[in-house]
Each structure stands twice: as structure tokens, then as C-alpha cells.
């Protein structure tokens, strides 16, 4: 029995396995989503590469790759009401706020932040970070990153970002722990 058939069997027999994993491995529907690096949309001011959005995965996930330079502000404290967020550090070091605790994740570490948990992130002091993010399940989010790009270039303002919190499931919060980390 091949490993894909075995995983399909596990998916069918264990309801705790996420639906989208089963869907991706369902050989009766061999559809898939492939994003070639050369074809991915790059947002140069923010360092974000858009990989795949919710409409391309039937809402299963959205993914992007972000490169953070030394001293980058990263993302302020926020939470996603309806999506877990996966972090996979490809290179460098990232400080991550998880509710009221800050942890550091480094190259090849994987972190999953559950829906509803306040979090923030930025490269660790003196470090860069290269990170793949996955949100699941997901609303369409690519326009959120395009809005951030416009903020970086001065073509949008903070008010626009605040007005999109429900649309993009990105809800900003305050954190004394994150503010004090300097």
C-alpha cells in the first residue's frame, strides 16, 4: 500500500484529521495548486511574496513568504478569529508574542498559533528572518498584503488598515509585553 493511499485511509477513518489534508491527498480528484517561484507576486517594499490565496484552495489556506531585514518592525499584536497561523522559519530568527509570552523561533522551527490567540512577530535583535506563513482556513488575504505594501510606500494610511480588520480577519490589539520587549 502506498503512503498516499494509507494517508487517505487515515483521513477517511479519523475525523480529527483536518479536511483540507484529505482533500489535497484525494486521488479521485487529482486537482492541485502549484505556484512557481518565478510566477509569485512579490511586494518589494514590504518583503512579502504572495504564494497562494484562499480562492485558489477553496478556502483551505492562504500562504505567503516574508523576508524581514534587521530592525524590521514586523507585525504588531493582532489575532485571527477564524484562522490558525503556521510559521515556518526558513532562515534567521523571529521573536513571536504568544498571548503574554515571547518565544524565539529560528531556522527550521515550525510554530502554529491557534485562532483567537493574540500574537505579534519581528526579527530577533540583530537578525534577519525569512518565514513562510500559512493561514487555515482562510479568507482571501492577498489584498491585505497589497494594502500593507501601499502603507510602506506612503500610498495608504493606517485608517484604511483599521477599517479592514473584519474583511481580512486581522484584528489589532494592545500588548504591554510586546511593547516592553525593546
Spans of model-derived segments:
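A short glycine-rich, His/Asp/Glu-containing loop-to-beta-strand
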Residues: 40-77, 83-84
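Short acidic-glycine-tyrosine-enriched beta hairpin
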Residues: 100-115
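Ligand-binding loop in jelly-roll beta-barrel domains
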Residues: 57, 115-142
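Glycine- and acidic-residue-biased ligand/ion/polar-headgroup-sensing regions
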Residues: 82-84, 88-94, 99
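Tight coil/turn sites that cap or link beta-strands
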Residues: 71-72, 108, 116, 126
